[in-house]
């Protein structure tokens, strides 16, 4: 099981939440943590996770999850409601960059994702979630590449694929309906021709009989 699947199962599923995406990060400025109970300073992995509740009305949140060295479990650390997110800074709109900043009402973090592509995927999901679930005040996305905001995102591509499939299916049904319609018209014409032939034959038979 991947780390993200394990986080979804351990952290969010028990609370009836659904994890939409996650990105593994490190602070751009190294920040020490307090000594652990064992007396030593712990190394850890950090994940920024985006989730929504399964119950209506849907609430979205961003959660910081950590996994300490030597442990197989994950720990929920900080959490913010999506409404508290004020700004998402992609740092450089002209190139793939793993760096980004998140500004909340009461917190500001500077991160480096494990890869630029992982950051890009998380940003696409985050932007889509903000557009879908936030109606009033949406966070500002600055210094982000156009593929995050525009039609090249994986979410838009998936939507386009579904739309294309529906359009193709609809077109196929329309063409089939047209073929059936033409067949029905042809059958009706043949029926009328047969009736006319029968009437003509009947008239000829009556004429010769007379």
Curated annotation (Swiss-Prot):
Alphabetical list of InterPro entries matching this protein: Sec3-PIP2_bind (IPR028258), STXBP6_PH (IPR037821), STXBP6_SNARE (IPR037822), V_SNARE_CC (IPR042855)
Pfam families found in the cross-reference section: Sec3-PIP2_bind, Synaptobrevin
Matching Gene3D superfamilies: 1.20.5.110, 2.30.29.90
Known function: Forms non-fusogenic complexes with SNAP25 and STX1A and may thereby modulate the formation of functional SNARE complexes and exocytosis.
GO cellular component terms, semicolon-separated: cytoplasm; membrane
Subcellular location: Cytoplasm; Membrane
Name recorded for this polypeptide: Syntaxin-binding protein 6
Keywords, alphabetical: Acetylation, Coiled coil, Cytoplasm, Membrane
GO biological process: regulation of SNARE complex assembly; SNARE complex assembly
Principal subcellular localisation of the protein: cytoplasm
Sites of N-acetylserine modification: 2
Subunit structure: Part of a ternary complex containing SNAP25 and STX1A that can be dissociated by NAPA and NSF. Interacts with STX4A.
Domain of life: Eukaryota
Residue ranges constituting the v-SNARE coiled-coil homology domain according to the UniProt record: 151-210
CDD domains assigned: PH-STXBP6 (cd14681), R-SNARE_STXBP6 (cd15892)
Species annotation: Mus musculus (Mouse)
UniProt topology in membrane: Peripheral membrane protein
Keyword Cell membrane: no
